[in-house]
Amino acid sequence: FLLINHRLDCPICDQAGECTLQEYSVEHGKGESRFLEQKVKKPKNVKIGPRIRLDDERCVLCSRCVRFSKEIVDDDVLGFVDRGSHNVLTVHPDKPLANNYSLNTVDICPVGALTSNDFRFQMRVWFMRETKSICTGCARGCNILISSRENKIYRQTPRENNEVNSAWMCDSGRMHYHTLEAKRRLTDPMMKRGKSHELIDWPTAILKATKGLSKF
């Protein structure tokens, strides 16, 4: 029944390769559809917040995002409207999904109904390499997975650690990797001399930093 009104968007869907419904369909489904009736059309590419897009034709009405927003973040802005096969996920008309943990709903969505504007159409997941790391956005030290290809980072997602960040991370931390692309980012150590800075080698920089930190 999940596939009755579900569009065959796998070739263009960002969730392809890590979609639970796709895996179930491949493992248990038939090679072709037996559904002859016309599928119900629902809203697509809906901006429900500054960082997220919604495709209601892919939504399976699991309510994970609704419960996360209400129970974890205490930002009750998502819900279902209409009935039967016309039931759709939507956002509060006067309040977008804009809290700093909104992108976690993309992680817990089992299909491609919720997608991140930042990662949308950037790279297929099977081409990327995942590396375990720690978020450097703040002092909390959230455990993360860095998804990259050919020395370019495409996204950062939370890695479960119940002692630190559980299974979540803030949107600010997810976007923090863009600082690596900043044009003014330092690529070599520099030392201030008078009113200017001059380049120094790494051993000298490490020695100076060690001496400075040893005072504390």
Language-model-detected regions and their locations in the chain:
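Fe-S ferredoxin-like electron-transfer domains
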Residues: 1-136, 140-144, 152
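Low-complexity, intrinsically disordered regions enriched in charged/polar residues
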Residues: 15-18, 147, 180, 203
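Cofactor-/ligand-binding subdomain signature composed of acidic, glycine-rich
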Residues: 34-40, 44, 154-215
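Short beta-strand elements
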Residues: 144-148, 158
